[in-house]
Amino acid sequence: GSVILKDIFDKCYLGDLKLNSHIIRTGTWETETEDGGFLTPEVFDRYEKIAKSGTGAIISEIFALDHRDRFYPYSTNMNYKGFFKDYKEITDLVHKYNVPILGQLAFFYYNDGLNQKVEPNDISLEGIRRLQAEVIMAAKKLSFAGFDGMQINMGNNFYLARFINPYFNQREESYGGNTEKRVRIGSENIKLIKDNFALNISCRVNPNDVRK
C-alpha cells in the first residue's frame, strides 16, 4: 500500500539509504579552507550541527577536479593532500548521528586536455571517455573517504547540464540527438559506478532552464 507522510521527521528511505527524516541538505559552497586546501574547524563544526539537527541526509559542497574550473575557488579540490583524512573525519562525524552523506561532483567547464573550455559539440569521443574516467576516479575517492553516495551535478547550467540540453548539444552521433543519447554521458557513468562501488548515486538536474 501507499505510505502516507504524517510528519517531515518521519523516517524514510532514499534508495537503500535509511533517513531519519525527509529533510535533505543540498550542496552549497563552503569556501572555508586553509593553505593547501585543508578544511578549517568551522567546516567540521557546521557538518556536525547539520547532522544532529534532524537532517535526513547531507549532500556535500561542490567537489572540483580541475584547478582552472570557474568555481574552483569556491569548491573543495578532490586532489589536495588532506582529502582522505579530512573527509573521513567528516563522514565519521555525520555517521555518529546515523546520517548518510553524498559527495557532489561538478564541472562548470570541462578541460579535455586540448581545450580548457571545450563545448559539448566539440568534445571528441576520447574527451568524453576522459571525463567519464574522471567521474569514476572521483567515485573511488568518495568511497574510500567513507561517503555513502555521490551526486553528479547535471544541473545549474554547468557543463553536464549543457551537454544534455539540445540548445547546446547538436551532436549527430551516439551522444547527441534524442534525450536518451544526450544523457548517455551520465547514464553510462551511473551504471559503471553502481557496478563497481557500493554508493548511492543521484543526479542534480534542472526541470527547466528557461530556454526554448
Regions found by a protein language model. Name each.
Residues 1-212:
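Flavin-dependent oxidoreductase catalytic cores
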